[in-house]
Amino acid sequence: SMDFLNEDKGLFSYKWGLYSAGHAVLDPVKSDISEAHVQKRDRSKVTLVGDSGGFQVAKGVLKFPWDKFKEPGGKCDEVRIKILKWLEHTADWSMILDVPSFSIHFDTGLKTFKECLEYTCHNNDFFMEWRTPGATKFLNVLQGNDLRTADQWYDAVKGYSDPKIHGEKAFEGWAMGGENMRWWYLILYRMIKMRDDGLLENKDWLHFLGTSHLQAAIQLTAIKRNL
């Protein structure tokens, strides 16, 4: 069997996996059938991270009508709630639905960093309002194309991770995107800022998007051991 999330049946197995809403069956009932190897996994043995589809937004695969992005009860809200409930049904840890700052470099209809940040905060507000605490743990995604914009992004979204502000609905971990995932000066700088803000306390997952090479594994392990 190629069911690599099942150590008893798979030809090989992994204890961790990542699955994106951008490629999934978002109807939980249908997903339970067609993606049973994911949904029926032994959750005591396998940890699954759910990607919200932000990368697909950046590449123009997951399209939003930006002029109606904030319309209450509109089609964008329908997409948001489908992704939110799929993540809660599927994943142990989940990305919020960010609009990556590098989206402006592709054919997405987005032109400015400000738009990406504004729309991400709108999605964060939606997830914060409609999430079921405990169904999945959310990772607050950090983006930014340079130090200045990375600081702007962090300052705008850090409150979503603060239990003093949002109580049990505060996001439980962090995900590093944009320059935060590859520029080591910025990574260390951000870790210090997060530490000083008390926003690494009781955060059990720090995810680096798009990072899989061996050198990064060594460097990130060193950081982890010193946090």
Predicted feature locations:
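Non-catalytic, usually N-terminal nucleic-acid engagement modules in DNA/RNA processing proteins
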Residues: 1-130
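Glycine-rich phosphate/ribose-binding loops and adjacent secondary-structure elements
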Residues: 133-227
